[in-house]
């Protein structure tokens, strides 16, 4: 599903979903990078405003979090932790379903 792609592909998640979707992601243990981007887009239902915030976030990412086309080391480590959490969850789900067969 599209909402899991940022975690799999190691990018900062900015997922356009229903309001307060970030609460579910945080509950699952994912880092949403609230300390470096504006995550208020999760709490607005106005699409134009949501996309304005996300557009500003892309500028922050490009100007402050990337060096020579790569994420800064501290950001990259956090992205890899998100990826690991996602993959572990998938592995657990797969084996649970497999054992049910």
Q: Model segments located where?
A:
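Pol beta-like nucleotidyltransferase catalytic core
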Residues: 3-9, 13-101
């Amino acid at each position: 599903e599209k909402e899991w792609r940022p975690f799999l592909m190691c990018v900062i998640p900015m997922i356009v979903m229903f309001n307060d979707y970030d609460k579910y992601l945080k509950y699952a243990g994912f880092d949403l990078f609230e300390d470096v981007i504006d995550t208020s887009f999760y709490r607005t239902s106005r699409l134009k405003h949501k996309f304005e915030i996300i557009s500003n976030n892309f500028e922050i990412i490009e100007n402050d979090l990337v060096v020579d086309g790569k994420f800064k080391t501290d950001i990259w480590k956090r992205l890899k932790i998100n990826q690991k959490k996602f993959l572990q969850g998938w592995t657990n789900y797969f084996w649970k379903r497999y054992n049910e067969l």
